């Protein structure tokens, strides 16, 4: 199998068969809250049964409300994979559009590592780090951000870079909002591994509206900005 320093999808379907990392506690395709309704409609149009579950669970001890910052489309291989083709390719979620970049370099201070990428058997990520960025495993390096971004743009298509940036921007905004609310004493959050039976989990933006931290219009603006 040919390896190269220019990433090109060969439609092997491996990314759809093995979506999660081996150590991941949530097996399936990550989704944002505004992607769920669209995914459900796409599944219904193709007579596909799906299961969506909340992940990244949080309890606000002040309001006693449980919310989540993400969801997962349960099942591996992906339910939309058929004959090595994605049945919803034009409407696929942002995590798929960003593949194989799991973390955009705009959002971390250190140099990239293998953990910044999703697994693809048809691309040599170690060679990319070594040959394009001059990085060697086990050694400390400092590279100019400009150099890292230039090499990413040479290796990965614009759409991949754009969508990985958008995805990380969302996650960064969510973290910043929670950090600000916590610092101001408006929420008191604790991470939750398992939701008690009968407890409703609401999406993060809905929680912010319920607690009057943002308006419905502001919620819709955020959702519409990132909706694909």
Language-model features: where?
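Short loop/turn segments that flank or connect secondary-structure elements
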Residues: 1-228
């Amino acid at each position: 199998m040919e390896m190269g320093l220019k990433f090109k999808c060969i439609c092997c379907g491996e990314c759809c068969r093995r979506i999660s990392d081996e150590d991941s506690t949530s097996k399936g395709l990550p989704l944002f809250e505004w992607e769920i309704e669209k995914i459900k409609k796409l599944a219904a149009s193709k007579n596909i049964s799906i299961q969506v579950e909340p992940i990244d669970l949080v309890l606000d001890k002040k309001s006693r409300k449980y919310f989540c910052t993400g969801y997962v489309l349960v099942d591996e291989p992906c339910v939309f994979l058929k004959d090595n083709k994605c049945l919803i390719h034009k409407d696929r979620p942002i995590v798929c559009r960003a593949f194989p970049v799991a973390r955009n370099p705009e959002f971390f201070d250190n140099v990239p590592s293998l953990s910044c990428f999703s697994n693809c058997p048809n691309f040599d990520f170690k060679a990319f780090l070594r040959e394009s960025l001059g990085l060697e495993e086990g050694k400390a390096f400092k590279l100019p951000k400009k150099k890292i971004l230039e090499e990413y743009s040479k290796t990965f298509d614009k759409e991949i870079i754009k969508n990985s940036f958008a995805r990380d921007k969302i996650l960064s905004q969510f973290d910043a909002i929670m950090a600000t609310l916590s610092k101001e004493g408006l929420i008191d959050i604790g991470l939750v591994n398992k939701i008690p039976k009968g407890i409703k989990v609401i999406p993060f933006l809905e929680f912010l509206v319920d607690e009057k931290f943002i308006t419905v219009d502001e919620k819709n603006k955020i959702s519409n900005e990132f909706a694909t």
